[in-house]
Regions:
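Generic structural marker for isolated residues within well-ordered, non-membrane alpha-helices
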Residues: 18-19, 31, 123
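Conserved PLP-enzyme active-site core in the AAT-like
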Residues: 114, 144-286
Length: 286
């Protein structure tokens, strides 16, 4: 079979090709092949009950009528995923504007000024809301940002901790479960141990080099972590805070009470859930 023509590559085999293939496997037709390979008891005996053909417009109306039968309920999923209000100007000029994700490569500065400006605005907003001096241009989501925080804090252990082999991260039990799952998965191959518990009751042992807390936590509680952060720093531990970035418009930014890393998801800032994505994670540090 020749593949040098687009029609051959994309339309499929010719009748002659089909006959050669059938002869090779010892059958005379596709019907005989199906009879020999698909059990009769699972095959449909009667023709498909299809309605009359519709135009594209009629089909659109039909599907809309079917969709209108769905019952819409308020989503209480939480845990880092929330319904949002997306400003119309953002929806039209960003989400529905393919220029943002189709034109050129983002690494050519001379043709990506708009994208570079958007990234600078993103980083500036993250720094302003978290109270931190540095922010990157986003990560995949909150859970992977947490894993990056652990890797970073592990690499930044003081020399005495490195010599003693300190390899424990304390994760508060009110951290989102998906965050804990991803952090645990990423920690295992690095030889990092994960310990969970209540932040206000845990004792930070000498082998603990970092802590992670949620703000507000998975139960929606707004905890005052100041004393815990001071305790962790006194023990030589760094503290990463998983923060709801929208709440930071009202709450005291973690950077103002001593957090070393602040991370989370920016889905809260107006990105629709899109059946589970996309959601850019943010990451800020000092």
């Amino acid at each position: 079979m020749k593949n040098d023509l687009l029609a051959n590559r994309h339309i499929g085999i010719s009748k002659k090709d089909e006959e050669q293939m059938l002869r090779k496997i010892g059958v005379s037709s596709l019907d005989e092949l199906i009879d020999k390979t698909i059990p009769a008891n699972i095959r449909l005996k009667e023709p498909l009950a299809l309605p009359e053909a519709m135009t594209e417009y009629e089909f659109g109306q039909h599907i809309a009528a079917l969709a209108a039968k769905n019952k819409l309920y308020t989503t209480y999923i939480g845990m880092g995923w929330y319904n949002t209000v997306t400003p119309a100007v953002i929806q039209r000029n960003v989400f529905e504007n393919p220029v943002w994700y189709t034109s050129y490569t983002p690494y050519q500065t001379e043709v990506s000024q708009g994208r570079l400006e958007a990234l600078l605005n993103f980083q500036t907003a993250v720094c302003d809301l978290t109270g931190m001096p540095l922010a990157n241009c986003s990560l995949l989501d909150e859970a992977t940002a947490a894993a990056e925080a652990v890797t970073m804090m592990y690499a930044l252990r003081p020399r005495d901790m490195q010599k003693s082999g300190a390899n424990v991260v304390f994760v508060d039990e009110s951290v989102f479960p998906q965050t804990l799952a991803v952090v645990t998965t990423r920690a295992i191959p690095q030889g990092i141990q994960i310990r969970t518990g209540k932040y206000g009751e845990t004792e930070l042992t000498p082998d603990t080099f970092a802590c992670i807390v949620q703000y507000p936590n998975a139960g929606g509680n707004i905890e005052d972590y100041r004393a815990f952060v001071e305790k962790a720093h006194a023990a030589g531990c760094k503290v990463a805070v998983a923060a709801d970035i929208l709440s930071l418009a009202l709450l005291t930014p973690p950077g103002e009470w001593g957090a070393d890393i602040v991370f989370g998801t920016t889905q809260r800032l107006g990105t629709p859930m899109f059946y589970g994505g996309p959601s850019a994670g943010y990451f800020a540090t000092r």
